[in-house]
Amino acid sequence: MRALVLGAETPAGRALAAALAAASARIALVAAGADTATAFEVQRLSRRLGTLSQAIDATNEMAVRVMTRQVAKALGGLDALFFCADLGAATAEAFALACRFTAREMAPGRGRGGAIVAALPAGAAADVGALAAEHAPKGVLLLAVDAPPHPDDAWARDVLARLAPP
């Protein structure tokens, strides 16, 4: 699997990154905020797991577009996006941007579909239903999972298991 974890600085992002690395996935970890402390935190995690890393403003359309293209190119395509960024009122906008640009990289015209997982705390605003309907014809599955305050390895493995083919 070639996966992008956007919001890798969150507890859910860290747990999913570790589970993906343990499953030998090729992954890119992206901090959803461009502040220095967050960027360094994700960079340290990336070094430990042996992955790519970036830090962007996840609400900036151009930043998200460029990042998804760079990640897809570096990984040889994208199979999954794990969106874990909790940006408060800006979460829904950032999620929609991430869906739009990663779905393009997963499009069936590129020979594949893909999956987008919104792993957000309960109550975080993200209109998964509308986005799922928009991207389903492109072969992209959207899945929403509640991210607990302190996700563990079992939670992360369960999320990954939901993406496994039947």
Label every model-predicted segment.
Residues 97, 130-166:
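C-terminal helical subdomain
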Residues 18, 22, 69, 100, ...:
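Short, well-ordered alpha-helices that flank and scaffold nucleotide-derived cofactor binding pockets
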Residues 76-80, 92-123, 136-141:
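Active-site loop of short-chain dehydrogenase/reductase
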Residues 28, 54, 82, 115-119, ...:
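Hydrophobic/aromatic beta-strand patches that form the interior of the parallel beta-sheet core
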Residues 32-34, 121-122, 147-148:
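Short, ordered loop/turn segments at secondary-structure junctions
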Residues 1-76, 80, 84-90, 151-166:
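Short-chain dehydrogenase/reductase
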Residues 38-46, 124-133:
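Short, aromatic/basic amphipathic alpha-helical patches
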Residues 7, 85, 110-121, 128-132, ...:
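Active-site beta-alpha turn of Rossmann-fold NAD(P)-dependent dehydrogenases/reductases
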